[in-house]
């Protein structure tokens, strides 16, 4: 099963995370299928960058979000509808 979860990067005591699509049974920092965003908790407030269309694509294919990623998803504003 695919999961959308955080993968830790950064130096000791200076965490920076990638939001990745990865098999559920892989290691936290293991090989991922796709990187769909980043999260830096050290800024005030924490900076979140998400490729919303890619996250929606993977969720439609059956990927599940971790609890933390769900909270980050709720914090990010939806992209405004393009005027065409």
Curated annotation (Swiss-Prot):
Biological process per Gene Ontology, one example term: translation
Organism equals Koribacter versatilis (strain Ellin345)
Q: Which domain of life is it from?
A: Bacteria
What does the similarity note say? Belongs to the bacterial ribosomal protein bS16 family.
- Residue intervals passing through the bilayer: none
Task: Kindly state one GO CC term assigned in the UniProt record.
Answer: small ribosomal subunit
- HAMAP family, alphabetized: Ribosomal_bS16
Q: Does the keyword Thylakoid apply?
A: no
Question: Which Pfam family name is an example for this entry?
Answer: Ribosomal_S16
- In the record, what terms sit under GO molecular function? structural constituent of ribosome
- List the protein's name: Small ribosomal subunit protein bS16
What taxonomic classification does the UniProt entry list for its organism? Bacteria, Pseudomonadati, Acidobacteriota, Terriglobia, Terriglobales
Q: What are the alphabetically sorted keywords of the record? A: Ribonucleoprotein, Ribosomal protein
């Amino acid at each position: 099963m695919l999961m959308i979860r955080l993968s830790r990067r950064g130096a000791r005591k200076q965490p920076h995370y990638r939001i990745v699509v990865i098999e559920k049974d892989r290691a936290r920092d293991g090989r991922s299928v796709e990187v769909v965003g980043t999260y830096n908790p050290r800024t005030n407030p924490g900076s979140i960058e998400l490729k919303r269309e890619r996250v929606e694509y993977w969720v439609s294919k059956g990927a599940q979000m971790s609890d933390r990623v769900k909270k980050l998803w709720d914090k990010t504003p939806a992209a405004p509808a393009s005027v065409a």
